[in-house]
Structure formats: structure tokens, C-alpha cells
């Protein structure tokens, strides 16, 4: 059966789409106009699909006209895969390929320094292989851990600002009668240095009170020693027996060595402490196993000692002394002394340290600048730092007098 001629012509007719029927044809460039094209935009055209590098000794397939590097396509055919890597068209052998020197000339025109480009690629690969391997990663991790440990040790040993005025508050660890304490050390920069260790008695000159609350004892002894009173030195030595914690029973094991030191800033509570009251920011450095009760009692002792020092400074002299050196405006005698010698009236009682307790002050913390949280007295500072603070700067605590200490 023969097919009509018009049917054969109709099968060879190219049917145009609606877009192709209405689009405007582009005008051919007939003059010497040049168009700038970046080499990066030609990268996909100049790249071998097998090695993904620039074509070298280009070979073109005769069937599908795809281009490959000569070494790449020959290796692919020898591996037994007799088809085009791009379109899977049948390739019998190397006879299905032909060299394409025109394309090589085009590449050499675009990249005249091909050897320099390849040398640069080799240097980049060598550098990557040297830096990006398991050994380099391990050495980098070890170096980072070593640097972190070194900086952490420096941060622990770094002195606080004003460390030349730092004093140590420590409980004695010797015989039970010499000085009782837990062994924690708390430093504050609000008074001059004092040597740690209790002293049974101080000379009349006062000096620094070697005590667990060394700053207060020393200041009180020094203030009263200037007036020549014998009992001021005794008080300076007696204050040296103050401790931060309950006394250790005889024969009890010594406390463990502190695991680390913690720096903290002690501020008065901005809401609960009135501006007229005694309030002072304190910078303290202590061991991590000190508890909140230790800080409360330390604070109560310090404030009591400093108030006692203030009272002794305002009212100098002592029982049995001579004429007071604090004369009135009219040249008369002092407030407590009797001019002409003789025994003066009894000195007013100074604030007692026997009733000092950790219940007198409450410690607060404001994690993240939020609401204030009351700290339990049994919490250690290390636990407080891990639970509430979690930042790499000194722990900030607030204190306020307890409303109903019991």
C-alpha cells in the first residue's frame, strides 16, 4: 500500500509552537562587535564531564558530539563501559572518537598560561592534603585544649584589682585551743594586709590582728593602741579567734583541700538595704567549698568589727588613762578623761562579737540580671557558681540584714 505524497510532506513539516510563531527573531551580528564574556561563565563548556577539569587533548564522539579529555574517555572505554558517559549512546571503540584541535586552540586562546594554571592547581591540592587530614585535625585539637588549659590556669591565678590591699581570713587548723575554723580562706580588699594565724596577745601598739578576720582585728587593735590602752591589744588578739564556721571537735579529720578558688563581688541589696545604713561593696576570693553560711558569718563579723573600730576611733582613750587628748572647743578636758590625771569613768561597752551569727545577714543572687533569689546557707559557692551564674566573670552576690534572725 502506497502512502499519498501529501501525507509524506506533512510528516516532515516542523510544527512551530505558539511562542515560536510570535517571537521576534534575533538579528545576526554582521559587524566587528565584540562581546565580553567572563571565563567563569564558560567553565561548564570547557570542562570535561569525567574529571571535572579543563579539557586537555580534546576528543569528540562522532555520534553525539560530546567532548572529553583524551585520557579520560580512553580509560572509560577500556574499563568496559562502551557508551558515552554523558548521554549513554553506543560507542564501539576509539574509532568512534575524533580529535578536536579547534577546541584546544580555543582553550589556549582563552587561557594562554595553561601551565601556570595547572601549577597553581597542584599547589592548592598539596596544601589541602597537608592541612585537611586526620593528623592535622588531631594536632589542632590538642593545641586548642592546651591553650584552653593554660588560659584557665592564668585566670585562676590572676590577682584581683587592688590585690595589694588584700587580706586573708582563715580559720586555724592547728591544735583545738589555738584557733577554730574550717580552713577556708576568704580575702577582702577593704582593709590592709594581715598575717594569717591566731595570736594569743598583741602588744600595746595594736598592729594587724592575725586572725581569721584579720582585717577587723588589726584595725581595732591599731585604733585603740594609739590611745595607750592595754586592753586594746588584748582585743586585737582576741578577735583573731573569730571563725567562719562551727568549731571543729578535737580529733576530727582536717577538711579536704579546696578544689579551686572563686572570685566574687559582695554588694548591698539595692532594694532591702537603705542608703543611710552601713553598706560597702566587697571583693572576696575564697575556696569553692565555702558555703553561703560561711559568707554570712564572715560578713557579720566584718561589719561588727568595723563598727567597733569606728566607735573606738570616735571615743579614744581607755580606763585608767591620763588626760584625754581630745579636748573640747573651750579648751576643757576630754569627754571621758579627767584633766590632771586620776582614774576616769568606765569606758562604754563596745559591740560584742559573741552574738555574731550567720543568721544576721541573708545572701541573694540575681542570675542573668533577673529577680533576686535567696541562697540556702548549706550551698557551696562552687555549686552556686555552676547552678546560677554560668558566666566567666566573678560571682556577684548581694547581702541584706535578715528581718527576723533566729
Swiss-Prot record:
Residues 230-406 are annotated as: Necessary for interaction with CBX2. Pathway: Protein modification; protein ubiquitination. It holds the Pfam family zf-C3HC4_2. It is found in: Nucleus speckle. Disulfide bonds: none annotated. GO terms for biological process: anterior/posterior pattern specification; camera-type eye morphogenesis; chromatin organization; chromatin remodeling; negative regulation of DNA-templated transcription; protein ubiquitination. Its EC number is 2.3.2.27. Residues 175-187 have a biased composition (Acidic residues). Residues 30-234 are annotated as: Necessary for transcriptional repression. The keyword Translocase does not apply. Its main location: nucleus. A motif (Nuclear localization signal) lies at residues 201-204. The modification Phosphothreonine is found at residues 24, 215. GO terms for molecular function: chromatin binding; ubiquitin protein ligase activity; ubiquitin-protein transferase activator activity; zinc ion binding. The modification Phosphoserine is found at residues 38, 140, 187, 190, 229, 232, 248, 254. Keywords: Chromatin regulator, Metal-binding, Nucleus, Phosphoprotein, Repressor, Transcription, Transcription regulation, Transferase, Ubl conjugation pathway, Zinc, Zinc-finger. A zinc finger (RING-type) spans 48-88. Component of chromatin-associated Polycomb (PcG) complexes. Part of the E2F6.com-1 complex in G0 phase composed of E2F6, MGA, MAX, TFDP1, CBX3, BAT8, EUHMTASE1, RING1, RNF2/RING2 MBLR, L3MBTL2 and YAF2. Interacts with CBX2 and PCGF6. Component of a PRC1-like complex. Component of repressive BCOR complex containing Polycomb group subcomplex at least composed of RYBP, PCGF1, BCOR and RNF2/RING2. Interacts with BMI1, PHC2, PCGF2, RNF2; CBX6, CBX7 and CBX8. Interacts with MN1. Interacts with USP26. This is E3 ubiquitin-protein ligase RING1. It comes from Rattus norvegicus (Rat). The lineage of its organism: Eukaryota, Metazoa, Chordata, Craniata, Vertebrata.
